[in-house]
Amino acid sequence: MKTHKLWRSIVLLASFAFLLQFSTAAIAQDSDDQDQSQDPPGRVARLNYSQGSISFRPAGEDDWVTGVPNRPMMSGDDLWADENSRAEVHIGSTAIRLGSQTGITFLTLDDNTTQIRLAQGSLIVRVRHVDDDDNFEIDTPNIAFTLLQPGEYRLDVSQDGSRTEVTTWHGRGHVTGGGLSYNVVAGQSASFTGNQDHLDYDLGQVPDRDDLDSWAFERDDREDRADSANYVSREMTGYEDLDEYGDWSYVAGYGTCWRPRAVIVGWAPYRFGHWVYVGPWGWTWVEDEPWGFAPFHYGRWAFVNSGWFWVPGPVVIRPVWAPALVAFVGGGPGFHFSAGVGVGWFPLAPGEVYVPGYHVSRTYVNNINITNTTVNVTRVTNVYNTVIVNKSTTINNITYVNQRVTGGVTVVSHDAFVNARPAAQNLMRVDAREVVSAPITRAVAVEPVRTSVIGAGQPVSVRPPAAVISRPVVAVRTPAPPVRSIEQRQAQAGGRLNEQALVRPVGPARPAPSVKQNAQPNQDGFRSFGQPNNSNNAEDNNNRAKPMLRPQPRVYEQQGTPTEEGRNAPSQDNRNAQPQPSRPAQPENRQFQPPNREPAESHPLVRPAPPVRQPTPEQEHQQEKKFNQWHEQRPSAPPQQRSQPQHSEPRQEKPKK
């Protein structure tokens, strides 16, 4: 009897312990889930090409400056291409190209949504992937256009904002405006005129190619041929410039690495560029070299045989973007170099843990490391606990490889750092022994000023006309709240933006799903190479972190037959996809779903699209008539040209100023 009672007590205690552990884990998981809602996006846009006069205005600011290549762009940022000018912006594999006299605003740019305000001008968008949870919307003064499939699209907005032309070379998009909705499919060009009270549209053939189209197609061909897509994901923003400026090779101990082809004596990563303050990440590196985006926001750097090699992380669908993968030297409060008040930094080496200096969750710290380097998951957890949970301001118990590389540490004055001045032209001479013994910090205790946000761009008078700046657009989705100026954010933080509680402790990280690292075709049709295993430690191998991937993108079959030049042409199968008000024929794999409108801070330049109403019989008759006219004029066979049907109509010239 006593033995039976003893066993029953043991079972009860064990059950209680299990329930307590389970409850604690659940609470910790909920805490981490809540904390993730405050994580910054894992991607940004990059200004990677400009021709002519390109002006940029950071979110929340009033000043327009020259567009600086490699400047990261986020929600709220504005870009203007003046007369006879062009610009190209990349978000992963998606290319956004601006024509002459074109102004855009990134209303929302986060992990799942790209929402662009197009107030005037011409915009060409090449979308290579659309995941199930991705949303891509372009808002103009009279319509909202949602891209439903990978493809190539062009939107033209007249100077007075009363007319929007939507052209679909391949793909499928959905138009909402004036209380009606339409689909625009491959091989169609639809023109929408009027406002939300009365919106009319015409349907026609895709116009002949103009100079902007030809330029965009040439840029696409360059990306299609990129050999770097064999070694990194196309969703790594900036991959397309690596072929032209460097070479891939195998490096023992690191695997396949990339090395810049021509650099000057004394070159080191994160030296030839400047720092800017980009919210919500804070201090962000902007490299001068035309190839200087991917190698400074993804992966790690290794010094091998007297040269620097960039070591990308495991090939994942979308690696997490970082503002700068460095560790800071002497950036803590109260520390001065013997040469004066300054800030130093060096690139992280493969396998070293990056600890963000901005507010993030434990899951974010895991993902930003395991998608950018091959690292032991236990090591990430240990560093996280030491630096964040225990709130250590310095990192003294970790040996950093590149801190001891001759010439690997860059130090500049406080004034040069905060005012976005070129680092290479403002170097401080610091003794190597002082650099090695200086404390390592994850963040810099340097308060930004307006120049930190504006960056290295010079003030310009070239900017959009006042009517374009203030012109509202029609939107289906609620945009991100407007960004406050740096002065407003500092005032809200009590005057010291960098002294806020950056990270609050959360529960254990969720285990990331295992991912096969074997070379295999991915959704782009290029190979994925796993990283070499450099450790002989069995425990290291068992604990090696697996990248936490986004859901595998659904594969959409492109409409049409590949042409001689490799671009899909509109297919005859699309002929009967008539744009029908309120009841459009939906794509096979994805349908337009109106978003749930949630209360949000209103945006002064966005008007919600009116609810879609049932078309009248007269409207349906007009829709059928327009479709039949378009259908009769369409070629009987797929065109042999690159992207537009034969016998196409000339593109209408926009009126000059």
Q: What are the residue ranges of the model-derived segments?
A:
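Short, intrinsically disordered, low-complexity terminal/loop segments
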Residues: 2, 30, 655-657
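Bacterial N-terminal signal peptides that target proteins for export
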Residues: 2-13
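Solvent-exposed, flexible loop/coil residues
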Residues: 5, 68-71, 77, 108-110, ...
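Bacterial N-terminal signal peptides
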Residues: 11-21
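Sec/Tat signal peptide C-region and signal peptidase I cleavage site
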Residues: 22-28
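Extended, hydrophobic interaction surfaces within ordered domains
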Residues: 23, 165-214
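Flexible, surface-exposed loop/linker segments and immediately adjacent secondary-structure boundaries
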Residues: 28-181, 185-189, 225, 347
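Low-complexity, repeat-rich tail regions
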Residues: 191-657
